[in-house]
Amino acid sequence: DMSEEMLTVAQQKTMDLMPRPFFSCQRLERLALPRAVDLAVCALDSLDYITEPKSCREAIRQVYRALNPGGIFIFDVNTPEKLRAMDGQVFLDEDDDVYCVWRGEFDRQTNICSYGMDLFQRQGKLWSRSFEEHREYAYSAETLVDYLKQAGFTKIAVYGDCRMAPPEAGEQRIYIKARKGIIK
């Protein structure tokens, strides 16, 4: 992940796991690991945040290089339909200690969805305000499968949102699994 904060949260949540998961803060398109791995998981639309298609293609190549023969790459992305539908929408999420409002904009020329999030968090009797800017590229399943094949992946499967079945029309998120070929 590119976020030290997100990696810290992930490490805290996996402290009791054995073997301990390996976390690394680096750009996926320049992925360098100390040794090859059997499984790579890229979750929470991480590939969507790579807003240059050639960089996404390179990231997938780097994951391929980082895997042992027979290794598996699993990732999820928001569907283009979901990102397009966010255009002009305002979203609100609140509970007793957090208030979040954000507005989405989709640029059909660049295929990028941008959204700014205003986050208000209660701290005692006061509220603190922070702002986050997000940009996600709308990759189609077909494009990603093509990138995987170009990198050398085989046995590529595309699944619907949290189902071990092909995606249906209007799906919000898809999951993709691919295997690095075994050298004979």
What do these predicted regions represent?
Residues 38-55:
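A short SAM/SAH-binding and catalytic strip from SAM-dependent methyltransferases
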Residues 36-37, 85-89, 170:
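Short aromatic-enriched loop/helix-cap "lid" or pocket-rim segments at secondary-structure transitions
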Residues 55-72:
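A short glycine-rich, Lys/Arg-flanked "PGG" loop and its adjoining helix->strand segment in the class I
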Residues 29-40:
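A short acidic, Gly/Pro-enriched loop at the edge of an enzyme's catalytic core
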Residues 4-5, 47-50, 58, 68:
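Conserved SAM-binding loop
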Residues 1-31:
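Class I SAM-dependent methyltransferase SAM/SAH-binding core
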Residues 135-184:
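C-terminal lobe and adjacent flexible extensions of AdoMet/dcAdoMet transferase-like proteins
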Residues 74-145:
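SAM-dependent methyltransferase
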